Structures are given as C-alpha cells and as structure tokens.
A protein has these predicted regions:
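N-terminal assembly/attachment segments of tailed bacteriophage virion structural proteins
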Residues: 1-106
C-alpha cells in the first residue's frame, strides 16, 4: 500500500513536501491511500471526510481513526484527480481548498 500525505492548516489543504507524489500510475486499484495531518484546533473532534474529484464527479470517504482513507478506484483512471476535506462538528461545517494529484497514464 502506498500512502499519500497531506497537510491541513485551517481551510488550506496541501501536499506534504516530504512525501513523494511522483510516479503515481493511473489504473491502480485498492493500493493508494491518503493520510491527513492536522495543524490547529479547528478540526479537533470533527467528523472528517475526504472528497476525491475526477472532472465534475465527487467521491466522499470518511476518514478512519488515523485520519486516513483508501482513495476511491473511480478517481484513479485519469491523468489527475483532486482532493479536499470536510469536517462537521455540531453546527460547524469546515471545508478546505483542493489539492491536485497527477498520475501517469500508461
């Protein structure tokens, strides 16, 4: 399993510069996962979901207790996909920017 690491600061989502996002090959299934590292208190105790986008389609996945999830196979078929996060706590809803992930099509 390969893990792609992301950083969350408030409403900003970025790729972790210490993580290798190179040589990701489209068509992978059940292999890629995403892990999110949170800075700040905004996200504490929120229920969190990652949304993965391919063109205009969205695929949402709840994060596990390690703030990770499997990346849906549906977005792993093109030369890129995007990801964002949503958090919900009581009446508060928080969303992040999108991060783009490139893939090699072979």
């Amino acid at each position: 399993m390969r893990i792609l690491d992301f950083i969350v600061k408030g409403q900003s989502l970025t790729k972790n510069p210490d993580c290798d996002f190179g040589n990701i090959v489209a068509g992978t299934r059940g292999y890629l996962s995403a892990r999110f590292q949170f800075y700040g208190n905004e996200w504490n105790t929120c229920k969190k979901a990652a949304s993965f986008y391919l063109e205009d389609r969205e695929f949402a996945v709840l994060l596990d207790e390690n703030d990770s999830c499997l990346i849906p196979n549906e977005v792993l078929v093109s030369d890129r996909f995007e990801v964002s996060l949503t958090g919900l706590k009581n009446d508060m809803l928080i969303k992040t920017t999108k991060a783009k992930v490139k893939q090699e099509v072979v």
